[in-house]
Design a protein with these regions (language model features):
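A short, flexible helix-boundary coil/loop motif
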Residues: 2-4, 65, 83-84, 123-125, ...
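Active-site-proximal, Lys/Arg-enriched surface segment
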Residues: 148-233
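Charged, often Cys/His-bearing segments associated with DNA-binding zinc-finger transcription factors
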Residues: 2-80, 483, 491-493
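Short, conserved catalytic/metal-binding motifs centered on acidic residues
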Residues: 103, 118-119, 143, 147, ...
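Short amphipathic alpha-helical "interface-anchor" segments enriched in bulky aromatics
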Residues: 397-432
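Basic, short loop/linker segments at the boundary and entry of helix-turn-helix/winged-helix-like folds
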Residues: 67-102, 148
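Electropositive, glycine- and tryptophan-enriched low-complexity nucleic-acid-binding patches
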Residues: 211-278
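An anionic, glycine-rich sequence signature occurring as long contiguous blocks
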Residues: 3-7, 306-410
């Protein structure tokens, strides 16, 4: 006799689905009158365009606005790119260095997945004709290998200087002022693996032993520490990339370069590039330690650092003991659909390296919310707990801003890493097995990402981005440039008009 199946039948599945819909409706009714942050999900509706004429107008509008944003930043890009020393023989050079760099940036703006795809797609006659209409500076498009050979020979760090100049220009123009936290620029830092191989293709690669079916095997990988501006509206602007390198470690003791060592180098570069910029660092649970706090204080940086349960036991002991004596250090609020309860203790002394001391402030947020259980269809209460070390004393009037609008948006950089890995920027693709060229492509990718982010959060394009999603918008623009949609006279008139970037 066979055992009865535990698998749900069709009737049970339909009943569960009906139960979930009822529970979700109940939650929506309970949230009535509460302002909910809009989600990132794109529209599920049919196209609002009624005929070919409307589609043509929409396509030209999207392309022209995207290109106007790019061309608005073009003088800064060209000025800095022109400073890069070109090692090639001028008499034998067909393409200027600036043209090759712009070509590389555009290949990432349009999300070309490889050098081969860039060759195949961007050299099509219609694409070239439209690209020349949009960018008259591009008299002809090079072969991708020409760009690769150039990146092998130049100082590619200068490409990242272009990125920093672009961001510095936006800061000077006060484009980010509405997103600042107590007058400071929130910068999130996080490390991630770029890609790995089973063979040593460059001496700079880090190495590790991984288990295989036939025994242990050496693996060689590239790891990068990224720093980006992380604003509370979700906008994340790339800043600096610090590559970990085998040569930066201690080769005599087989101690490799690590994220904390890379952070010291990144912090020095960040201070060098933005000497007077008021900064609020957002760091994860790897960073709450004396040397990192010392770097922040010496550079006059504020910080919000994730404090995990196992970190800084002496600080946790002080917090648990003092919070009972400070019942006034508490704050409750309803934020979106969550009930939040904050407790904090200021001026905790943290000792490290024998005689060194830092004063830190600890805050713990416990929150609860209701959601539909996907297994039962019932409304259940969920809870979570977050703790941070703060560089400034905590008070009821700054707790929401520092925790919800700053510290929690450290996750922006994790979302950014997910985007560049999975949403078309080919972060994990090795565009060249030359270390210098590989880094050069990485910096070009970050520039392309920045331009797309500015378009995504611009007032003139926000409606179509919300309709199609970010990837859908980029595909929409790329397909338009690939086809016979553009009216040359209208495009030239549109691009000739004055333009000012306005962010939402």
């Amino acid at each position: 006799m066979s055992k009865p199946s535990r698998r749900a039948n069709r009737q049970s599945i339909l009943a569960l689905r009906k139960q979930k819909k009822k529970a979700e409706k109940k939650l929506r009714q309970a949230k009535h009158g509460v302002k909910i942050t809009p989600g990132a999900a794109m529209s599920n509706g049919k196209s609002r365009l009624k005929d070919v004429a409307q589609e043509s107008q929409a396509r030209q509008q999207a392309v022209s606005e995207q290109v106007r944003i790019f061309r608005n930043q073009l003088p800064i890009l060209l000025k800095r790119l022109s400073r890069i020393e070109d090692p090639r023989n001028a008499k034998k050079t067909k393409y200027q260095l600036t043209l090759l760099m712009i070509y590389g940036i555009l290949s990432f703006v349009f999300q070309m997945s490889s050098r081969r795809e860039a060759n195949r797609e961007m050299s099509l006659p219609m694409f070239k004709q439209n690209l020349k209409l949009l960018f008259p500076e591009l008299e002809d498009l090079p072969h991708s290998d020409t760009l690769m050979r150039l990146l092998e020979r130049i100082d590619v760090v200068q490409i990242e200087k272009v990125q920093l100049d672009l961001v510095e220009s936006l800061i000077r123009k006060k484009k980010f002022n509405r997103y600042l936290i107590d007058g400071r620029y929130p910068i999130a830092v996080d490390g991630t693996q770029k890609f790995s191989r089973d063979y040593l293709w460059s001496e700079e690669c880090l190495q590790r032993t991984v288990g295989k079916a036939d025994g242990d095997q050496m693996q060689y990988y590239v790891y990068v520490l990224e720093a980006s501006l992380a604003f509370s509206n979700g906008m994340t602007i790339p800043l600096i990339s610090e590559f970990l390198s085998y040569s930066e470690g201690d080769t005599d003791t087989d101690k490799q370069d690590c994220e904390l060592k890379a952070f010291k180098r990144l912090a020095a570069r960040l201070k060098s590039e933005f000497k007077r910029l008021p900064i609020l660092l957002l760091l994860d649970g790897l960073y709450p330690n004396g040397p990192v706090l010392e770097i922040c204080r010496n550079n006059h940086w504020d910080f919000m650092i994730v404090l995990q349960d196992g970190n800084l036991s002496s600080v946790w002991e002080e917090y648990e003991g003092l919070k009972k004596l400070l019942p006034e250090n508490r704050y409750q609020q309803k934020w979106a659909n969550r009930r939040q309860r904050f407790r904090w203790v200021n001026d905790i002394e943290y000792y490290y390296d024998r005689f060194k001391k830092q004063i830190v402030h600890v805050v713990v947020c416990e929150e609860s919310w209701k959601e539909v259980d996907p297994d039962t269809g019932e409304v259940v209460t969920k809870t979570s707990r977050h703790a941070w070390i703060s560089g400034q004393a905590l008070q009821p009037n700054n707790i929401h801003q520092r925790c919800n609008l700053a510290a929690r948006h450290r996750w922006n950089i994790e979302s950014e890493i997910l985007v560049v890995k999975r949403h078309g920027y080919q972060y994990e693709h090795c565009f060249s097995y030359n270390w210098n060229a590989m880094k050069g492509y990485h910096y070009l990718m970050r520039l392309g990402l920045t331009l797309n982010v500015l378009a995504q959060y611009s007032e003139c394009l926000i409606q179509i981005v919300r309709e199609k999603g970010v990837r859908g918008f980029i595909k929409f623009v790329r397909n338009t440039i690939s086809g016979p949609w553009l009216d040359a006279a209208w495009i030239k008139q549109r691009l000739a008009a004055t333009y000012q970037l306005r962010l939402i």
